[in-house]
């Protein structure tokens, strides 16, 4: 029997403006800021969606950040499950000026998905599973 277990905890986003980015996740997607602090010299804001969190931090003094165009190896996006009226939720985001990289579509007979652009080049998948 293993002496440990694992559970998903967070997605970590590095942002040019962590407080504005955290506010975007709150205002557009309904997250809640549960903590705002400084870690290793950079502001860090914890945004909860009722489970694993999005942690948004700023640039540390010794770091150099750069924008990354195009497809990159590694993490591509993170997904948020939408319960309820998926198309209505997406329409509400669109009315707030949120840009979609993929419009709502049926991924399979039981799942609708869409992709939106979040601050700092982050891609967020929205999904609604009819069987859950």
Q: Where are each of the predicted segments found?
A:
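Core segments of cupin and vicinal oxygen chelate
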Residues: 12-54
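Active-site/binding-pocket entry motifs
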Residues: 53-54, 61-62, 99, 132
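Generic preference for hydrophobic
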Residues: 54-56, 126
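A short, acidic/glycine-rich surface segment
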Residues: 61-67, 102, 109
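Vicinal oxygen chelate
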Residues: 1-4, 7-16, 45-48, 66-132, ...
